[in-house]
Amino acid sequence: MASSTFYIPFVNEMGEGSLEKAIKDLNGSGFKNALIVSDAFMNKSGVVKQVADLLKTQGINSAVYDGVMPNPTVTAVLEGLKILKDNNSDFVISLGGGSPHDCAKAIALVATNGGEVKDYEGIDKSKKPALPLMSINTTAGTASEMTRFCIITDEVRHVKMAIVDRHVTPMVSVNDPLLMVGMPKGLTAATGMDALTHAFEAYSSTAATPITDACALKAASMIAKNLKTACDNGKDMPAREAMAYAQFLAGMAFNNASLGYVHAMAHQLGGYYNLPHGVCNAVLLPHVLAYNASVVAGRLKDVGVAMGLDIANLGDKEGAEATIQAVRDLAASIGIPANLTELGAKKEDVPLLADHALKDACALTNPRQGDQKEVEELFLSAF
């Protein structure tokens, strides 16, 4: 087995009440001015003020950038960077789901390294650590609060740039399920399927290790048991807390084993059509699993067993098929669209989408490597 590196934030606060503990632990840190990166909904709902008030108790001032939209753009990064500089912010807090986290990571990275966001597309392109970042999570899916992945949309090229850089790993991650209760069903479903995709892709990645395998399988087990409950009753705290832990475990897995074609393809759909990332993953997942089954059927069966399927006595091929069907059934049960047509994607764009997907950093560790024609066919199979 080749050598491997395991990346994770220094401190990871989990469970009910962890937000207040994380802020209290900033006492004595020396930080004076925080930039809170979030979105308009979080600001209007009072959660941004809640965090700002907690910071005040520790003698820390804060400025707010709440212009983050789903699929954060280069423009958003530049807007946030200006506020950071204008307020002499010495650290960054991201508050929300994957979009605020990714935007904050890019802001923190460019703040210390200079240049443009696109300079850091790819793997470990930066030379200096980013500004310290605390990521406070409000969704159970992307795990961006604890990863070295940062996805930013280049609105000029209409592509999502995958920045995979150890320097954007947050200093502290916070997963307080009390902040997740307000997630609507659709967002709960999309982010939950994103987490399940992380587990599948990390477990079948060419860079998987025994550590990432353990994280991925436990994540898949917890998601299968709790996602539908969390969708049906968002106030079910045991389900919310389980999903918070599950998505974190899936994040530990893919942060260190990387991903595959589902994410490489979903990034293009999100960048080109501005579609929600988790939904794109959910629609593509069974199709990519079927494509990969010819080389990792046994691994797909393993995930199915972890999800609670009675397939231990089946052969690898049959077990993989049953697992893929279970993924389809779960997605349908929580209201995920059936295909890319429902999302508004167009078949005539597939050649361009496939070309960009093959250049995405996430494609490198897919267990079955395809060419332009095969990836085009994969896209088309999802229409």
From Swiss-Prot:
GO terms for molecular function: alcohol dehydrogenase (NAD+) activity; metal ion binding. Keywords: Iron, NAD, Oxidoreductase. Its EC number is 1.1.1.1. It comes from the Bacteria. It catalyses: a primary alcohol + NAD(+) = an aldehyde + NADH + H(+); a secondary alcohol + NAD(+) = a ketone + NADH + H(+). Its cofactor is Fe cation. SUPFAM superfamilies: Dehydroquinate synthase-like. The keyword NAD applies. InterPro entries: ADH_Fe/GldA, ADH_Fe_C, ADH_Fe_CS, Alcohol_dehydrogenase_Fe. Pfam families: ADH_Fe_C, Fe-ADH. The keyword Chaperone does not apply. Belongs to the iron-containing alcohol dehydrogenase family. Homotetramer. In Z.mobilis there are two isozymes of alcohol dehydrogenase. This is Alcohol dehydrogenase 2. It comes from Zymomonas mobilis subsp. mobilis (strain ATCC 10988 / DSM 424 / LMG 404 / NCIMB 8938 / NRRL B-806 / ZM1).
